[in-house]
Amino acid sequence: MYGNWGRFIRVNLSTGDIKVEEYDEELAKKWLGSRGLAIYLLLKEMDPTVDPLSPENKLIIAAGPLTGTSAPTGGRYNVVTKSPLTGFITMANSGGYFGAELKFAGYDAIVVEGKAEKPVYIYIKDEHIEIRDASHIWGKKVSETEATIRKEVGSEKVKIASIGPAGENLVKFAAIMNDGHRAAGRGGVGAVMGSKNLKAIAVEGSKTVPIADKQKFMLVVREKVNKLRNDPVAGGGLPKYGTAVLVNIINENGLYPVKNFQTGVYPYAYEQSGEAMAAKYLVRNKPCYACPIGCGRVNRLPTVGETEGPEYESVWALGANLGINDLASIIEANHMCDELGLDTISTGGTLATAMELYEKGHIKDEELGDAPPFRWGNTEVLHYYIEKIAKREGFGDKLAEGSYRLAESYGHPELSMTVKKLELPAYDPRGAEGHGLGYATNNRGGCHIKNYMISPEILGYPYKMDPHDVSDDKIKMLILFQDLTALIDSAGLCLFTTFGLGADDYRDLLNAALGWDFTTEDYLKIGERIWNAERLFNLKAGLDPARDDTLPKRFLEEPMPEGPNKGHTVRLKEMLPRYYKLRGWTEDGKIPKEKLEELGIAEFY
């Protein structure tokens, strides 16, 4: 087999058993790898109704067939599990170097089961795999954890994925961090890892990922790298200003969420933009493995020294969404989240919900005691509560449950800007209605990157679409994006490659690496299979389409108050039935057996 090794590690932390298991190429041709392999294993092996924080939940860390190769951005991996935040599937994706190192060790994935009696970490060096005591690093921040493990194993080459105090304390939006500041962030994967008493996974390898036709693959890689470098976004805006280049663009288009999505225009946007960051704090770019784009930032602050990030989503979540415009405070807060192991989007979203609850008089000063009040623009709130959330101290314990449960506890769940209890990212759907449909139908909830309709609706990729068009063509484009991103994730590539590359380009890379002769349609069918399999998992886990495939009332009933999208709401009711029909699902959002048979997954019906 090429690309994939056809091997994964299975670790049962309850028993201490470690196995290396194999799978054949026919399975790879059906699921490709990474995200696809993971959902196959979950459907085959696990009851979707398990408690996400119980030993019965499985945590799957998986790289794709192009991870660890010279394919542009070939450093991505996925963490797939049942989310403690949403109760549904989550697939948290991360870059850096950890995923590539897993492939260099000779494995495609790690399946973690059970729960250790005491804190442990897993150490992998090629064929050597062991479970080690982690009691001495339990409670440590991410940078301390990585430094300690490197010293213990005697290697600077080792790559580490770990949790911070937030994961240990089962914060429902805890992240898994790797390579210091890269995050598998969404859905509480860090809490699942913490529930298993697993502090870290450290891996180093000496192998080379097998390629079917090395000469052809290198020619294809060179061609695709050149396409990316010549693209104005992948080769221009992203390397020059990082993902925060979007701040001004999204704000000018009137969908940059402010104060818990109360409006979509922020007068201080430039002060927290990628341009402002580059001018004031940027030290250098830091690309992930095999990445020709290099959107990663290294900034320097007097308070924390050199630190990576923040990304666009983090700038917004810890900034405009809280009415905060001081960029230094935002960078410092992002650094705190990375060190403590917190998803910045959910952290900011939960604090924004608390601020609106406070603004409307639902959270009282007497509840907070000596803690800072939840006032918009209060940077003291930002730094104080990030620490409290991670440690579940004081009011931070309530915040650690996420914004939906927080708002629900005060009788106002409508003030939580979530889909399926996952906090929404930095695009108000009243300014991009196809993107809003993507939020509502996303398998992991309020997520942008699995259905990035901002590309056609705002940025013009692959071509410009009216953000307020709700036609079948718009819905078909969304479905294509959802299936394509499932494919890209499963291949082990970054979604930023879609700025410059199209479906045919991914076909070329995969065929050259794997030695297959698949058509573009064959690969998109894999993506469709994965999307439907994840939907099936959710339905088995208790998804009610009528209840869960929706948006917060704010977007459906409150017109945008100002800016280019003034007066607009999201016409979800007009789009959702047609989305179901175009997906081949029933009128009530279920997947009929005939569709599963068409996709070759009727065994899971």
Swiss-Prot record:
Inhibited by arsenite, iodoacetate and cyanide. Shows an active (AOR) and an inactive (RTP) form. InterPro entries: Ald_Fedxn_OxRdtase_dom2, Ald_Fedxn_OxRdtase_dom3, Ald_Fedxn_OxRdtase_N, Ald_Fedxn_OxRdtase_N_sf, OxRdtase_Ald_Fedxn_C, Tungsten_al_ferr_oxy-like_C, W-dependent_AOR. Binds 1 [4Fe-4S] cluster per subunit. GO terms for molecular function: 4 iron, 4 sulfur cluster binding; aldehyde ferredoxin oxidoreductase activity; electron transfer activity; metal ion binding. Tungstopterin binds at residues 76, 93, 95, 182-183, 185-186, 338, 342-343, 444, 450, 489, 493, 495. SMART domains: AFOR_N. Its cofactor is [4Fe-4S] cluster; tungstopterin. Gene3D superfamilies: Aldehyde Ferredoxin Oxidoreductase Protein, subunit A, domain 2 (1.10.569.10), Aldehyde Ferredoxin Oxidoreductase Protein, subunit A, domain 3 (1.10.599.10), Aldehyde ferredoxin oxidoreductase, N-terminal domain (3.60.9.10). It holds the Pfam family AFOR_C. Optimum temperature is above 90 degrees Celsius. Optimum pH is above 10. This is Tungsten-containing aldehyde ferredoxin oxidoreductase. Its EC number is 1.2.7.5. Keywords: 4Fe-4S, Iron, Iron-sulfur, Metal-binding, Oxidoreductase, Tungsten. SUPFAM superfamilies: Aldehyde ferredoxin oxidoreductase, C-terminal domains, Aldehyde ferredoxin oxidoreductase, N-terminal domain.
